[in-house]
Swiss-Prot record:
TPR repeat spans: 154-187, 191-224, 226-258, 325-358
Name of the protein this chain belongs to: Cytochrome c-type biogenesis protein CycH
Transmembrane segments annotated in the record for this chain: 2-22, 95-115
Topology class, membrane: Multi-pass membrane protein
Species of origin: Rhizobium meliloti (strain 1021)
Protein family: Belongs to the CycH family.
Amino acid sequence: MLFWILVAILTAAVAAVLLLPLMRAAEPLPSRHSHDIEVYRDQLGELARDREAGLIGSEEAELARAEIARRMLSASAADQAVAERTPKRLLSNRLAQAFIFLCLPAVGLCLYLTTGSPGVPAQPLAARLADPGDDVNILIAKAENHLALNPQDGAGWDLLAPIYMRHGRLDDAVAAYDRAIRLLGPTPARMGGYAEALVAQAGGLVTAEAQNALQKALALDPDDPRSAFYLALGLKQEGKHAEALAAFRKLAESSPADAPWLSLVNQHIAELAAAPAGPGPAAPGDPAPGDIAAAKEMNAGDRQAMIRGMVDSLASRLKEDPANLEGWMRLVRSYVVLDQRDRAKDALHDGLRAFPATGEQGKQLLALARELGIDAGGEAE
């Protein structure tokens, strides 16, 4: 009921604003022709005075008087025509008033009932933020609004950081983890999450900053599998195959038999065990140890250019040898880092052709897609 009362009040207010100019009595404005008539009368008087003073002859005076009289009659006729049109203007005003009073509210109501939803409650932004339901984007916006007002809320940054990570907002994830660590202090989960975000931000490179965070996480919890995995991956990227193999084997031995990361660890072990002793040449699509060292010293722009080259090389390698689960996972994640989500989706589908979704390795690809917010389409069924 309140809604319709508000509608009636607003309609009346709009109608009043529109009607006021129409209802105001029209003040007669002097027309141009009325002014001309006054001028002609003055000219006749001046002509008579000139005639009496002998400044003009009688014949010239008669001719001038006839011309002025003719002009005066013409102006009078035009002024009368203007006066006759005034009732028509008043009639049009009355019609406009009737339209505003009767038709405008009716037309507006019909349009609203046809295209609107009067039975649906209003959903202003503030109300949606107060009750976001299952909308993750609204939850994120609500958390961001809260943190904008309370930037020292470490728990809020700690909660938001992994959400940013799952949605591929890697720069925001790195910043949120950094704020949480500064405000709440380091924990294995925070340091490991921070390092993982740094690795993802660098396109899969375990940078020096990420290694430092991983070592701090392991110092707090020597059994943290995530930190152990990325440190081993960093050793592999640096060409320290023997150390990387030992680290991966240690992680495999300490992991439960049903650990979701175990198959990926075993794949690294198999690759390293089959590799020749010593650093050796880097596989196509993988950075050489020298490239890793150089990347750690690069600025963000140069590192991004290097990452794009590595990603293109990795994509070419996977076309020739698609039986590489880690390669597909790296490629999908790298495209997300480069904000090329369409290519990430294509890479996911290519990977699922090599590793069907019904298998264990295909499920890992689907899990990665869900983590990064990539639509797997019919492949997930």
